[in-house]
Amino acid sequence: MKKHIVELIMGCLLLICFYYLSREAAAVSVEMNQKQVIVVDCGHGGMDPGMIGIDGLKEKDVNLAIGLKVKSALEKKDFQVVMTRETDVGLYDEDSNNKKVQDMQKRIFLIQEVKPVLAVSIHQNSYEDSGVKGPQVFYYRDSVKGEELAEIIQEKMNDYLEVERPRQAKG
């Protein structure tokens, strides 16, 4: 039950984040007068379950459920959304010697090929220290705008959740 509440909170947080992201991207879209593309990457999938909770809940399933909701919310805001996956599949060939590496390479290639205004990768992190709580936003360290946006999102999520020991955005 507690795990599902955490999932619900994380889903709500992502929707809040996308609200702020969509406002920024909408301003750019108006200037360019065209539909902006956002890539939503639902982490893990296929043979890679990601973290597995005490109750057997797999990170890949949570990521996909959140990603599909994010896609729907963004499309309602008139964005074109490209998903790395919309079902429980990995982005690797079955005969690949290193499925994890190939999966990551294909995700990167997709983002480079699409050239989105924004790419978001959804994951659920776990930590050995049970005192560590709250969301953490990651950004491409060489992107000044990405860092600024990540810090805004991090601050909004920490405020919304009233996190006692808030994390910092990380590049």
Residue ranges and their predicted role:
Residues 2-9, 19-33, 64-171:
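Active-site-proximal helix/loop segments of hydrolytic enzymes
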Residues 36-56:
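Short glycine-rich His-centered loop
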